[in-house]
Amino acid sequence: MLHTIAIRGYRSLRDIVLPLAGLTVVTGANGSGKSSAYRALRLLADCGRGEVIGSLAREGGLESVLWAGPEQPAGARRSGRVEGTTRTRPVSLEMGFASDDFGYLVDLGLPQTAGPASLFARDPEVKREVVFVGPVMRSSTTLVRRTRDYVETAAESGRGFDRLSASLPPYRSVLAEFAHPGAHPELAAVRDRLRNWRFYDGFRVDA
């Protein structure tokens, strides 16, 4: 069962952690972020289908879906002005979930090595991924971790990590590349869970 959904930096959602139960109803005023949460969940599900980069492109690119408010809301509250600012930190969109058995985190950003004249300088890419066991992500529960093109899996000895790949393309997820039930069942389980999520934009409540 899913316990938690976390979203940081997506549209009107600066940083939320949403606890889930058997049935969770999200309510709020217009503009409070309900639609943003729904769309972020669809993006997260696309990670399991290997389609998250294409989905971001169809939304207008990563910069079109990022949180546009101030990086430091506390300072904005003190001044009484809440408005967008020039970014001083790396572009980042983070999403993830935690459940009884496995959890997953993905961090999407922009290339830092492509020059400004590159045609791919604004293309979104996967910066970081983590697959962990149980409802809480920590070093001791991490099974697979990816930083840019480098992927590691927890060593069978229980100490440290073993290299899985040092050349994973930035547009590919570990879930699309290595989720083989025989070799990496934990990746296959997370991938299949995301693939099995279903989304309905509307449904009858009187039937």
Where are these regions (language model features)?
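Conserved P-loop NTP-binding catalytic core
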Residues: R39-T113
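Phosphate-binding P-loop
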Residues: D15-A21
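Hydrophobic anchor at the beta1->P-loop junction of P-loop NTPases
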Residues: V26
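The conserved Walker
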Residues: N30
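N-terminal pre-Walker A segment at the start of P-loop NTPase domains
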Residues: M1-R14
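Conserved lysine of the Walker
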Residues: K34
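Electropositive, glycine-dotted interaction segments
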Residues: S92-A207
